[in-house]
Amino acid sequence: MRIINADGLILGRLASRVAKMLLEGEEVVIVNAEKAVITGNREVIFSKYKQRTGLRTLTNPRRGPFYPKRSDEIVRRTIRGMLPWKTDRGRKAFRRLKVYVGIPKEFQDKQLETIVEAHVSRLSRPKYVTVGEVAKFLGGKF
């Protein structure tokens, strides 16, 4: 089991690395999901996520698609988009993923990993928004 600290990691790069680990059969736990960052212009990011959460079918709005508002679910959905979700292999890989806001008690004394290639300090122009800020904008709790 790998425990990854998402604090200061770029969401897309984190998601692609984690998706690869899941497909290789590893169990992955991500902590501090609200501190992962999405790079780009703040207003563009907010408008993109706001538009996604408003998507519904005209015939029956209860049929989806459904996009999350909580920060841990935003990270899970991003990783799901990088897995072959419609196959049995992809669904089994997705079940091996756990994402938490903050650090739960059971993982506080464990060694946390980070992904150096995905850290925000490697950006030349640091324009970014945290996943927690996006979740607050969408009306999520965390």
Curated annotation (Swiss-Prot):
Pfam families: Ribosomal_L13 (PF00572). GO terms for cellular component: cytosolic large ribosomal subunit. Keywords: Ribonucleoprotein, Ribosomal protein. The keyword Kinase does not apply. It comes from the Archaea. GO terms for molecular function: mRNA binding; structural constituent of ribosome. GO terms for biological process: negative regulation of translation; translation. Gene3D superfamilies: Ribosomal protein L13. Belongs to the universal ribosomal protein uL13 family. Part of the 50S ribosomal subunit. This protein is one of the early assembly proteins of the 50S ribosomal subunit, although it is not seen to bind rRNA by itself. It is important during the early stages of 50S assembly. HAMAP family: Ribosomal_uL13. This is Large ribosomal subunit protein uL13. It comes from Pyrococcus horikoshii (strain ATCC 700860 / DSM 12428 / JCM 9974 / NBRC 100139 / OT-3). The gene is rpl13.
